[in-house]
Amino acid sequence: MNSWFLQVSKRLGPAGRRLWLLGFMGVVLAVTLGLALRAARESATQRTATYTELLQIAQAGQATAVEVSGDRFLVRQAGGAVVTAVVDEPTLRQELVSRFAGAGASVDFASREDPSRAASAVLPVVVLAAVGFALFTVSRRRSPKVFSDVKAGAARAAVRFADVAGMHEVKQELAETVEFLKSPDRFARLGGRPPRGVLLTGEPGTGKTLLARAVACEAGVRFLSASGSSFQEMFVGVGASRVRALFAEARKSAPCIVFIDEIDAVGRARAKGHGDSASAEHDQTLNQLLVEMDGFDHETGIVVIASTNRADMLDPALLRPGRFDRKVTVPLPDVRGREEILNVHAGPIPLQGEVDLSYIARGTPGFSGADLANLLNEAAILAAREGADAVDPTHIDRARDRVLMGLERKGVLVDEDERYATAVHEAGHVAVGLLAPSCDPVHKVSILPRGRALGVTQALPEKDRLMYRKEYLEDQICMLMGGRAAEMVVLGTMTAGASDDIQRASTIAWKMVAELGMSHLGPICVGDGHPSRSPALLDRVDETARALTEAQLSRAIEIVRSRRGEIEALVKALLEKETLGMDEIQACFPADRRPRPEDQAA
């Protein structure tokens, strides 16, 4: 039967199978609707009666025919009406039969089921059979002979290394992969073994996918891409089948690049023990991926490039040499890289002459390539909303505020007492930020509600930091405590506005003590999963971290007390203008003026 079905299916072809399936489903639907309508019509003409009503009909001689099926009576009256009733007691059924027969009605003992009951029994079977057949046909059509989630073809956009701004060291590392795909004999002549796989790791938005496309375009080979999550399914065996289909397509397309985005979805470390069915399906898919990466020869011209921002989750067997021979970290761009990225994304955006991309690059440390693209896009949207002909520095500055501090909520009505308390809180942050020597310069302060905050103080680093000194971290805690210190000194009370500051300060203090060894406890590490996490040691870590936070709060209180007059002047300016820039802030603190970053650069 199965072979006959397969032969007929091949003869029909894809279009014929679809038409046959649609026809079959149409017939099933017509039969189902017919049975349902018939049962509905019959039930509409019938009325359910009681035993007493049946006795009255029999005594009046209104019945012309009576059908008895078990405990069910169907009585047809002279006017065409149909009455049904269920009589459970056998003696009462016998009495009714005698009365109807005595009244001259024909009595028939029928064994057939009522049409409505037959329809209710047949309908579920027919519907389930139709749904099962449809699922069977669809599953055959979606069989993993061709992995539908693979995006094949040459690199879709002409992306080359020149279009990938920044990341000079990363591009040099990947250039050898391009040379291998272009001229593999150059490596084989000296017995060199080209890499089978390249793992790109880094923060989200740093351009890992863009780099993989650039490699394929530079080498002039096909680019097969798939997401790691597309290998995961609830059906057992589907993930492994899709892995086989992907590499089968790669062998046909060789030389080519197979790119697996977010490989941690399929390549995370296998759990110990048996686990549940979902873990078994994941392990089977991962095992198939490991086998496939070992299964092709170096001469096939297939290079697997994968990306992830969770390299710590990957299975060790996947990371060994012979599978992913090279691990390339794609870092966040430095100031030179940020300027190059801004130049690329600013190409289609009309900028006014005073827009300085190098200044923007210096003021956006920690931004990824995606963040910088989003920054310029937000600035262009603001300019278009205002009907401007070009993007000016104010648009970029407001776009940066939106990215860093959140959306401005102009419709929120804030009570005057809360506005004053918010201004005092933010002024405390500013005062500590100006006087603590290692703090990043305060760039802007605002008491306009943004996101979930009623006010924001923005401090921008002067340079990229590759490591953090103890003094810098202590000053960060002190600045975070500046808002609470101002509340205690100026308001004489405390508000809930410092909750986020306290949480961030506690996190920094705990890491300084528990992971970085920056306390009298010495160089210890009791982070998550570390074997030396004894309860007594954790208690000492908590006490030391709390003491560190309290010490910086006391220091912030002293700074606020020493600058009480300047803080009150800043509060007054904030209540008038709501948002103050660097020059307006330093006008309130003339004795604590810091040189601007552009002045230092000059």
Curated annotation (Swiss-Prot):
The compartments listed are: Cell inner membrane
Q: How does it sit in the membrane?
A: Multi-pass membrane protein
> Where is ATP bound in this sequence?
202-209
Query: SUPFAM superfamilies from the xrefs?
Result: FtsH protease domain-like (SSF140990), P-loop containing nucleoside triphosphate hydrolases (SSF52540)
Q: What is its EC number?
A: 3.4.24.-
The protein's required cofactor(s) are namely: Zn(2+)
* Keyword terms, alphabetized: ATP-binding, Cell inner membrane, Cell membrane, Hydrolase, Membrane, Metal-binding, Metalloprotease, Nucleotide-binding, Protease, Transmembrane, Transmembrane helix, Zinc
Q: Which GO terms describe its biological process?
A: protein catabolic process; proteolysis
Provide the residue positions that the database annotates as binding Zn(2+). 425, 429, 501
Query: What molecular function terms (GO) are annotated for this protein?
Result: ATP binding; ATP hydrolysis activity; ATP-dependent peptidase activity; metalloendopeptidase activity; zinc ion binding
Where do the catalytic residues lie? 426
Q: May I have one GO cellular component term?
A: plasma membrane
Q: Which residues lie on this side of the membrane: Cytoplasmic?
A: 1-18, 139-602
Q: Which Pfam families match?
A: AAA, AAA_lid_3, Peptidase_M41
Checking CDD domains in the record gives:
RecA-like_FtsH
- Transmembrane domains' residue ranges: 19-39, 118-138
Give the family this protein belongs to, as stated in its UniProt record.
Answer: In the central section; belongs to the AAA ATPase family. In the C-terminal section; belongs to the peptidase M41 family.
- What does the annotation say about its assembly with partners? Homohexamer.
Q: What does this protein do?
A: Acts as a processive, ATP-dependent zinc metallopeptidase for both cytoplasmic and membrane proteins. Plays a role in the quality control of integral membrane proteins.
Name of the molecule in the record: ATP-dependent zinc metalloprotease FtsH 3
The lineage is: Bacteria, Pseudomonadati, Myxococcota, Polyangia, Polyangiales
